[in-house]
């Protein structure tokens, strides 16, 4: 089975042709979330046509287009419900109509975190598990749950996909969503520079010399610089508290962590596993904490199960 897939991020979009558990062809375009989704739809359609041509595949050979979107999505109605400072015109767009007119294939859309979990369940670290929570650590924090082999969506399509907005500190930092002390506000990539700059001793630390990233944070912490060490330990504590909260909320067999931060998985995973073992209330046994396997391919590889309806709520 072949399918088209679009994975839309804040700064780029990947358009691909997938077959079963393999990406046959892919083309990545630069985008700008602040500009909106409408202006780039022609470019997305053109890129999808290009990957089909390169693979000598016609639209009639594709099961449809699976669209991976960075916002709240009503999968059943095939539309975007709400955004957060990226592609804010999306709720007003008829994406299904655009797809049918431009490509002539069926259309399905899902939240990016859910699509990543579908991919990991189909071809990666969640394969063989029916009850899974996945957390993506990057610019933001994505969270999604699968219960008894079915994606958790809820009455308003919000269930399970707002893990980054679990409150972890009642008097913490202001989040972009408007709440206080969300996991994102305390330990996501977008909040990291401010967290570092407001830490005592920052001006004389290694972090003051370069643009602040998680990769540099963990690197300088390994060298023993006290400011990066302090910030790193606080990030780990937030992620660990979030892990336990998600375990208590969704009763998974396994919690999977993905995203660019997991380049430091050899240090992060043992911390999270140890914390979960000590603090999660799971009398039946221990929840496994593991690293995602598919990286940036996860959302694209979620196309086949999404179009087949394998994980419908």
Residue ranges and their predicted role:
Residues 44-65, 106-107, 125, 202-206, ...:
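Phosphate/pyrophosphate-binding loops at sites that engage ATP/ADP/AMP, CoA/4′-phosphopantetheine
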Residues 33, 37-45, 61-65, 71-133, ...:
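Glycine-rich phosphate-binding loop and adjoining helix at the ATP-binding site
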Residues 3-7, 62-66, 132-136, 176, ...:
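Short glycine-aspartate micro-motif
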Residues 2-46, 60, 79-82, 151, ...:
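Short glycine-rich, Thr/Ser-proximal phosphate-binding strand/loop in the N-terminal lobe
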Residues 13, 23, 180-256:
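A mobile "lid/hinge" subdomain adjacent to the ATP/sugar-phosphate binding pocket shared
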Residues 18, 110-121, 262-313:
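Glycine-rich phosphate-binding/hydrolytic loop that grips phosphoryl groups
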């Amino acid at each position: 089975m072949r399918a088209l897939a679009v994975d839309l991020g804040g700064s780029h979009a990947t358009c691909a042709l997938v077959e079963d558990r393999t990406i046959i062809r892919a083309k990545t375009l630069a985008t700008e979330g602040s500009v909106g989704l409408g202006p780039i739809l022609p470019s997305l359609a053109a890129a999808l046509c290009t990957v089909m041509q390169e693979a000598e595949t016609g639209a009639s050979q594709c099961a449809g287009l699976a669209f991976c979107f960075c916002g709240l999505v009503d999968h059943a109605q095939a539309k975007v419900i709400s955004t957060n400072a990226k592609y804010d015109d999306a709720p007003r767009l008829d994406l299904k109509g655009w797809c049918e007119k431009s490509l002539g294939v069926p259309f399905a859309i899902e939240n990016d975190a859910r699509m990543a979990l579908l991919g990991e369940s189909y071809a990666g670290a969640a394969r063989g598990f029916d009850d899974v929570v996945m957390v993506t650590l990057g610019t933001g924090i994505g969270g999604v749950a699968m219960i008894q082999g079915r994606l958790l969506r809820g009455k308003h399509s919000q269930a399970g996909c707002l893990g980054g907005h679990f409150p972890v500190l009642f008097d913490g930092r202001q989040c972009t969503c408007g709440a206080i002390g969300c996991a994102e506000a305390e330990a996501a990539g977008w909040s990291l520079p401010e967290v570092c700059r407001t830490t005592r001793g920052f001006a004389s630390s290694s972090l003051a010399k370069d643009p602040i990233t998680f990769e540099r944070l963990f690197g300088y912490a390994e060298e023993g610089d006290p400011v990066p060490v302090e910030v790193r330990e606080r990030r780990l504590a937030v992620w660990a508290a979030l892990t336990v909260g998600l375990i208590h909320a969704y009763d998974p067999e396994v919690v999977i962590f993905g995203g660019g931060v997991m380049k430091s998985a050899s240090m992060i995973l043992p911390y999270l596993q140890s914390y979960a073992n000590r603090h999660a209330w799971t009398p039946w046994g221990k929840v496994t904490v593991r690293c995602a396997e598919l990286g940036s391919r996860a959302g694209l590889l979620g196309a086949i199960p999404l179009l087949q309806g394998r994980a419908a709520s």
